[in-house]
Amino acid sequence: MIKKILIVDDSPVSIKIMKSCIPKDKGYELFDAADGRIGVDLFKQIRPELTFMDLTMPVMNGFEALEEIIKLDASAMVVIATADIQVRAIARAHDLGAFSVIKKPPTKENVAAAIAEVENELAGRG
């Protein structure tokens, strides 16, 4: 069951949009980080069940942050949220351990679908 969701994105506008797409009635605790380094540090502290990660960020990009998070927790559920939907970028994200990829800007529908997929995966793990 998802309780905590971490959003890692260098754009305050993108974070605001993502937060607006996450259902309010589920009681999720939302956290955000402005770059990959802060995101990894926050992940260590709060251990969210779901992380939405941008790819293009300063300090530490999303690929590097994803790699660090998967080293910390191989079963971490990281959904990449990016405008870069090139096949190569998506393949690299999956190779590094991303659970799935959604296109930015996010919509309530694709965020809800991503959350449902993660919930199903977590339920299947028991």
Which role fits each region the language model picked out?
Residues 12-31, 96:
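Two-component/phosphorelay signaling modules centered on CheY-like receiver
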Residues 35-38, 61-64:
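Acidic catalytic/metal-coordinating carboxylates
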Residues 46-52:
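Active-site beta3 strand of CheY-like receiver
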Residues 57:
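Receiver (REC) domain active-site loop signature in two-component systems and cognate sites
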Residues 64, 85-100:
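Alpha4 helix (beta4-alpha4-beta5 surface) of REC/receiver domains from two-component response regulators
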Residues 88, 106-116:
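C-terminal output helix
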